[in-house]
Amino acid sequence: MSEAPQARRVGSVDDHSVYDDAKTYYTSEERHNNSRSGPRQRTYSQNSLLGQMERLGLKEPFRRGSHDESNHNRRFLIQVDPTLESLKSQEDTDGNMQITIEDNGPKVLTLRTAGSNGHNRFDIRGTYMLSNLLQELTLAQEYGRKQVILDEARLNENPVNRLSRLIRDHFWDALTRRIDASSIEVAAKDPKDWTDDPRPRIYVPKGAPEQLEYYKKLAADKPDIRLDVVELPETITPEYVVGINKAPGLLAVDMEETVDPKTGERVMSGRPFVVPGGRFNELYGWDSYMESLGLLVNDKVYLAKSMVLNFCFCIKHYGKILNATRSYYLCRSQPPFLTDMALRVYDKIRHEPDATEFLRTAILAAIKEYHSVWVAEPRLDPVTGLSRYRPEGTGVPPETEADHFLHILEPYYKKHNMTFKEFVEAYNFGRIREPELDKYFLHDRAVRESGHDTSYRLEGVCADLATVDLNTLLFKYETDIARTIRNVFGDKLVIPAEYCVGSLQPGQVETSAIWDRRSKRRKLAIDKYLWNEEAGMYFDYDTAKRQQCNYESCTTFWALWAGVASPKQAAIMVTRALPKFEAYGGLLSGTEESRGQIGLDRPNRQWDYPYGWAPQQMLAWTGLYRYSFTEEAERLAYKWLFMITKAFSDFNGVVVEKYDVTRPVDPHRVDAEYGNQGLGFKGVAKEGFGWVNASYIYGLQIINAHMRRALGTLTPYDTFIKALEDNRNRALSEMV
């Protein structure tokens, strides 16, 4: 893998960097004072005169401002508000506060150069530069600037460098939350709260008295935010969770003691975490692992470490890594990635004094989660020894839009002569029994726990499936735990009482041999029930029907990531399976044949063809690298990165949750049940989407330096590879 790219730092006025973050760039008075170019008043009067002439429909005599043909360190002297209005009225022809390839403006705007004190002019041309100008001026306006001196380098910046920089300097910060006094109003906001009074609320587990005291004091100190603080009972049942659905709230996560820089006093501070973005404003399970891959590349190690510790807190107090940290997710988990996440953080901090203790805590938490959640009833299938997504729970999932299940529930509420709301209330609290509906929601909850909500692969069967994804992840848990106990803890890990579940006893010693045996048993079961030699891929296994499924899913490549495939199986997968999933923009979630026909009665599902998701890409790249399929990993990474970069360049800096990897022009447009997160910004995108941000940063480590240069010039993969072949053939012919 190539080294992490560094943004080029170019000296500008007063030695500030051209590529400073927006806050630094736009709050510097010194940077935006045109003292080097002459008196400021003269510039204002000239621009004022020009504005009057333009409003009167008069043209300025050419002699007053010749075009600037120089191209070294060019900077523009811009009056923010009038220029922004001119830009929008001229170039944003569809009025959506974005400048894209779909707008029909002239695609050119003339700006005054700062070096000439506004006398000379220069044309800003093309969608990319104009949309960057819109973004920069939107930010300048938000920071209260009336006039700016804007570096041209921020407008024509290499798109790979620009997006990488925005992710590193802006998007991660915009997505970071702490559940404490500094930002609880932001962290508590829940776009999925459909109740009549969506006030901020936090649920604190029974065994966290310091947190309970902290939040009660916070509520008393800030009565205006109306924070409701609730202590959870010792035992949390599905019935209890249904009972609090009308009062949804955040779940407390870990806190740490820090020193207040102003007072020097020790205070409680929430451990930070990254949220996915859009309507997902809480700590999510597998999203966090994917995000950590990018955070670690960007040297945000403390943030990734904090997320691991937050997960350890969740396992200790809630019994599992939750789907997400909201009260309505208390019975539901998500795909388990804790061991790999913790080991990646440990590799970055192993020189720190508390590194070994950090890893010990994470591995102990993973062992507890493994035994209490994944290899216990109801998720364990005792016949195969494999595990399923099969969460507890009752009633209708409350986080969905109010009418999401309308078509499912309509026959039932009509049957009982009730309104939709009346029926949901009666069904949720067990006043009405409908076994078929119970079965439907059992599978629906399982789909949501899988993280693949929704897909025809899982619909109506998920709770019965021993899926490829879950069981390869558990194999990875088993091998990670074995290796860590052997290599870090001297082949002996003592289990403290707080981590004991099931048959585990306080003081019990875990050795690598125990976990090696578990992984070998799981591999045998995976090969027996999930591997299909003829198809050259892994399939889910239906534990109710006792047969292998035939839906072709991209999760087959998780076996490479986890290392459960033999070298022979890996080679067969690359030959037979990979061509079925590879598309213009990377890997498809599933094949078109497996998805089946789509129509009014059978709409698209977002985890099916033709959509591609960041987790599937990253796990496949890593898995292919693991088995030395470097060329394939680089090719897939390039396609994904090119698609993201092209959409970013053509559509005003857009970065979204998922993509249609079959659409070359507008892959961010998704026609599925939940739409797409990351689209609804005005002027400038400020957060992207968590795991797509990570996939971009991580993917740049996968491709080689030559590919990175081609990516910066927006060269499609086929064009890039043809140019390489032509150059190679030319070189060979010259040698003859």
Curated annotation (Swiss-Prot):
UniProt: substrate binding residues: 279, 286-287, 323, 332-334, 399, 448, 451
A GO BP entry: trehalose catabolic process
Biased composition, class Polar residues, residue ranges: 35-47
Keywords, ordered alphabetically: Calcium, Cytoplasm, Glycosidase, Hydrolase, Metal-binding, Stress response
Subcellular localization(s) per the UniProt record: Cytoplasm
Catalytic activity: alpha,alpha-trehalose + H2O = alpha-D-glucose + beta-D-glucose
SUPFAM superfamilies in UniProt: Six-hairpin glycosidases (SSF48208)
Gene3D superfamilies reported in the protein's UniProt record: 1.50.10.10
Keyword Transmembrane helix: no
One GO MF term attached to the UniProt entry: alpha,alpha-trehalase activity
Superkingdom of the source species: Eukaryota
Biological role: Hydrolyzes intracellular trehalose to glucose. Plays a role in pathogenicity, specifically in proliferation of invasive hyphae in rice blast disease.
Family: Belongs to the glycosyl hydrolase 37 family.
Protein name: Cytosolic neutral trehalase
Lineage start: Eukaryota, Fungi, Dikarya, Ascomycota, Pezizomycotina
Gene name tied to this protein: NTH1
